[in-house]
Amino acid sequence: MNLEVIAQPIVLGLIVASGPLVIVSLAARRGNL
């Protein structure tokens, strides 16, 4: 098993999961929540 084949889905998953978290954290810092 190639590491690239395993790493690509993990990286994509982290990017998709971190997207909303970054937006929420930025909104929390601005006091919009």
From Swiss-Prot:
A core subunit of photosystem II (PSII), probably helps stabilize the reaction center. The chain crosses the membrane at residues 5-25. This is Photosystem II reaction center protein Psb30. It is found in: Plastid membrane. It holds the Pfam family PSII_Ycf12. It comes from Aneura mirabilis. Its main location: plastid. The lineage of its organism: Eukaryota, Viridiplantae, Streptophyta, Embryophyta, Marchantiophyta. GO terms for cellular component: photosystem II; plastid membrane; thylakoid membrane.
